[in-house]
Amino acid sequence: MKTFSAKAHEVKRDWLLVDADGKILGRFATQIASRLRGKHKPEYTPHTDTGDYIVIINASKIKVTGNKFEDKMYHHHTGYVGNLKSIAFKDLQAKKPEEIINKVVKGMLPKGPLGRDMFRKMKVFAGSEHTHGAQQPQVLDI
């Protein structure tokens, strides 16, 4: 008997709708990353993108434990000398709440072309409205 290896064009991908309201950021992101990779499917193949499309709503209502709401900082470098920029979690949540989930989930996916393809299948929205109604996403409770 041969080992099964899924082909990317043969994989059936579902559209899932996930509500982030009141969820804890890290625990929520691990579930999303696992679904994006396709690890919940029996035909999971590590070198092939077998994951589902995921639409996340209410990103602005995500929670963190402990003092991270006040203390957690996100850093990025502009590329110029001495330009390391920092922003606090609470400020980033007020300005761009989608970016928080994007950063966390992207860090949990494989690095390289395969991980970038997986990341593109995640759509994050700050409010409860989304633009993917035509895909008829199924509600997933995490």
UniProtKB/Swiss-Prot annotation:
| Gene Ontology annotations for the cellular component aspect, listed alphabetically | cytosolic large ribosomal subunit
Q: Which InterPro entries match?
A: Ribosomal_uL13, Ribosomal_uL13_bac-type, Ribosomal_uL13_CS, Ribosomal_uL13_sf
Q: Which GO terms describe its molecular function?
A: mRNA binding; structural constituent of ribosome
- Decide whether keyword Ribonucleoprotein is in the record: yes
Family membership noted in the UniProt record:
Belongs to the universal ribosomal protein uL13 family.
Subunit annotation = Part of the 50S ribosomal subunit.
Sum up the protein's function in the record's words. Answer: This protein is one of the early assembly proteins of the 50S ribosomal subunit, although it is not seen to bind rRNA by itself. It is important during the early stages of 50S assembly.
Designated name of the protein: Large ribosomal subunit protein uL13
In the UniProt record, what gene is named as encoding this protein? rplM
